[in-house]
Amino acid sequence: SGYQGVEIAPFTLKDDPREISEKEAEEIGKDAASSGLEVVGLHWLLVKPSWLHLTTNDNLLRKDTIIFGKHLVQICAAMGGKVMVWGSPQQRNISPDWDRNEAKKRAADVLSNISEKAQELGVTIAMEPLAKKETNFLNSAEETIDLIKLVDSPACQLHLDVKAMSDETKSIPEIIKDSHNYIAHFHANDPNLRGPGTGDVKYEPIVDALRSIEYDKYISVEV
């Protein structure tokens, strides 16, 4: 029956997403509904403002990131969205002179604060593992689940992405099955940056794995 929902990148609505009001977000949700679409949620969260950062050791910058994250939760909920895909690779990189464990704790602190608001409004933060060539933090589902456990909130879960999983040593069906307790959202984008089935990845085993864990949420095509 075609596409049933749409994901929105906040910076495509306004150059500074902090200026998006809840009323404007509600109108976007209504516009989508009038076209027969549900706003699934948001992605590309920290593209703008460009200085926001998940693992930063700057306390003020971390507070800014928390405030911005809570704002995104509010506009996501106002649109009727239920999920926020947290990728933003450059805005989570760990500097070589930082202690990785301390950086991970800082990330957990940011996400814990935002997740409080998310849980209140029925939104899930879906943390996205990404390939090593994109970022040096959260490069596997396993590493990301470790962070999710540290956050310890039902509103902070896992997002899986076919392109990113293709960079892991484990097979994609294996990752799906091993992560099944945490998966909140799924992107079926091919490593060739086009749609599913246009490259070398075989999607039948992926679909079978999703069915085997009884995944019943959206599968988004990111191209």
State where each predicted segment sits.
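N-terminal pre-domain/capping segments
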Residues: S1-K82, S112, Q119, S153, ...
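Short acidic/histidine-rich active-site segments
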Residues: D216-V223
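Proline-centered loop/turn at the N-terminus of a beta-strand
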Residues: E38, K82-V83, T124, A155-Q157, ...
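Hydrophobic residues in well-ordered beta-strands that form the structural core
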Residues: I8, V39-G41, V85, M127, ...
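Acidic/histidine-rich catalytic cores of soluble enzymes
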Residues: G5-V6, F11, E102-A209
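Glycine-rich tight-turn/loop motif centered on a GG-T
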Residues: T56-R62, N93-K105
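Active-site groove signature of glycoside hydrolases
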Residues: C76-D97, L121-A131
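Short loop/turn segments at strand-loop or loop-helix junctions that form parts
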Residues: W44-V47, G87-Q90, V223
